[in-house]
Regions:
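Phosphate-handling catalytic cores of nucleic-acid transaction enzymes
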Residues: 1-170
Length: 170
């Protein structure tokens, strides 16, 4: 969503995401409840505590993440992840966040339906998502659009995958 400063780009996104945020809050409350039960069972060393699995928080949205975190969160929620950046250029700046970060290439691969795999995070097992579903939404100011018009985004086809919405002024 593109518009001048103060045009009101953020409120429509907040309204659209309200049901998702409410759902995510319910997931968080459920996770906290299950974690309390798990920790209580482990603390008392109940007979069934060894069979209990530590609960995992399912997330629906991300706003600040590494590539490894994106794969992990998507692995924990195979239904999909939405990336919501109020200022979309913040996400795109993160494509260079850690030097030779393959974030941009991975986002292009996700768009093409390629699997995601994470073997570098220190977990008991690697994470793999066969059919990723990652949606990206955000806003920017009209004058900042030129920051998207650079070879890094144009030559890779990244810009071709963006739907730009520019509402008419009142």
């Amino acid at each position: 969503l593109v518009g001048r400063p103060g045009m009101g780009k953020t409120p429509p996104l907040q309204l659209a995401y309200k049901p998702i945020r409410e759902y995510e809050r319910k997931l968080f409350d459920k996770f906290c409840y299950e974690l309390d039960l798990y920790e209580a069972a482990c603390a008392t060393k109940e007979s069934g505590s060894k069979e209990m699995k530590k609960p995992i928080l399912k997330r629906v949205t991300l706003d600040d993440f590494t590539l490894e975190a994106l794969v992990l969160e998507h692995y924990n929620n195979l239904r999909g992840i939405a990336i919501n950046y109020d200022e979309i250029l913040g996400l795109l700046a993160n494509t260079d966040r850690y030097g030779k970060n393959p974030m941009l290439e991975r986002l292009l691969s996700i768009w093409s339906g390629c699997h995601l795999e994470n073997t570098r995070v220190k977990n008991d097992r690697p994470q793999r998502v066969e059919e990723p579903c990652v949606n990206i939404i955000g806003t920017t100011q009209t004058k900042r659009m030129k920051e998207l018009m650079v070879s890094k985004f144009m030559d890779t086809g990244f810009l071709d995958r963006i739907l730009v919405v520019y509402p008419k002024s009142k």
